[in-house]
Structure formats: C-alpha cells, structure tokens
Amino acid sequence: MVEVRVPATSANIGSGFDCLGVAVNMYNKFFVEEIEEGLIFEGCADKFKNEDNLIYVAMKKCFDKIGYKPTGLRIKIESDIPVSRGLGSSAACVVGGIVSANELAGGVLNKKELLDLAVEVEGHPDNVNPAFCGGMTASISDNREVIYSKVKVSEGIKFCALIPDFTLSTEKARAVLPKSIDYKDGIFNVGRTALMISALNNGDFHLIKYACKDKLHQDYRAKLIENFYSIKEECEKLNSLGVFLSGAGPTIMVMLREEDKDFSKNIKSFLETLKNKWEVRELKIDKLGTVVNNRKV
C-alpha cells in the first residue's frame, strides 16, 4: 500500500496574485493499493466514487504518461482540508493522486516531472508548488515550463485561518475579475509582492500589512464574502501582521506573531456575532510538503 500526505496551501498572500503560495499544517492523506479488479473508494461521498474523482483523474494522467495499467485500485481518503474554501483542496487531491500513482508504478517519474504533470492537471502552480515542496514558494509558468523558488520566511510568524461554513468555487471567484487592469494597478502589486518577499526574508514583519494590499483580485472577490471588510478591520484592531483572502476565498488568512496568544480567542468572539459560522484555526508553515510512505518526495 502507498501512503501519501499532502498539506493544505494558501495562495496569493495578498499582493502575490497567482504566484505566491504557502503550505500549512493541515493535511489530506491518501492510501492507495492495486487490487485484482475494479475501482473502490473509501472516505468520500458516494457522488465522488467514480472515474471523475479528481484523485483518480490525476492518477490516470500519471499512469498514462508512464504507460502503466493497474488491474484495479482501492483509494482511501482521510481529508482534513475543507473543499472550496481557498485552501488548496484540489491541488492536494491532484498532487496526492499523481504521487501515489507514480509510487505504485515503481517511481518512474522524477520530482520535476511529477511537478510539471501536477500543474498540467491542476492549473495553479501557486498551490501545487508549495503543496509539493512545502514552505512558501514563488511560481511562474514560462512556455509551459513550471519554474519556482522557495521563499525564506524568518522565524517568529504563524497563520490563523478563518474558515466559513459556506463555499466559493474558484470558477465563480475568477468570473468576477476584470478582463484587463490599469498599468498603475499592476505596478501597485508588483512593488508589494517584492516587499512581501523581502519582509518575510528579513523578519520585517511590521511591513507585511502594506504588502498584503492589492488591486488585482481581493476587492473584486470581497463582495462574494459576507462581512469580509468588517472581519478584516477587526483583525487589524487585534494587532494582526496582515490579513488576506486565502486563494480564491472564502477563507480569510491572518498572519500573526508567534507569541500572540490572544488573537484566536478574541477574533472567535467577534465572529460569533456574525450570521455565518466561522472556524478559527491556528496554523504553522509546513516545511516538508508531500510525503510518500513517510519520506519526502
């Protein structure tokens, strides 16, 4: 049996739209084995127990590339990453499927080939790269080649995810974005993305609040998330380092100093006054990324 663990990811980190992403210690686990025949799923809803399941789609893509034909598969899923909340659940399924398929087939593909294949299936390197490699990454696609660099994050920082009880599909969140942007808005984000990386590198945490600002995606998507601005304002009052929309949302991610012991309790009290239910979850950066059979890929 192959066991794969993949972390959740939070993409964009404010100004770093479609390029920055970070892995956090919330995980999906996949247990896969080859059987005599058939396709058996465990741990997911009945509507996902078929060949359209994203994990199986990713596995088949890998098998086809390698030229391996399993006689049958049993796929067990233990999921801790909420779906359609902006925490990289799709990326986790794709990475988990491809890595487990490659392992079943004898480990034919190398790390670069696995990564390129995962981005081809999932389409979002800002989620796939940190899920695969761990830590924070800056990613681009250049002539269909996936290129990334790990971002050094100074010690002393943690995250807090505010996860609502409602979902928001990536497709819907993409649909509200403009077809074009002003030149000045592009410059606004480029500068702040550079500032974010530098601030995290050097431990200049007081600069993060400026680097979280953007003009490319968050304001457009905020209208899809009830009470986004009031929650953001409350987080800022509680001395957060920065607040941003996690991926396409609706989860709101907060950056905090590691020694901050009061934020979670205080923001939870505020969220309880709102219409929707919100889960408050403190998180750390996952530095390992995807692990297969207890070893880093």
UniProtKB/Swiss-Prot annotation:
Transmembrane segments: none annotated. GO terms for molecular function: ATP binding; homoserine kinase activity. The keyword Amino-acid biosynthesis applies. GO terms for cellular component: cytoplasm. GO terms for biological process: threonine biosynthetic process. It is an enzyme of class 2 (transferase). PROSITE patterns: GHMP_KINASES_ATP (PS00627). PANTHER family: HOMOSERINE KINASE (PTHR20861:SF1), HOMOSERINE/4-DIPHOSPHOCYTIDYL-2-C-METHYL-D-ERYTHRITOL KINASE (PTHR20861). This is Homoserine kinase.
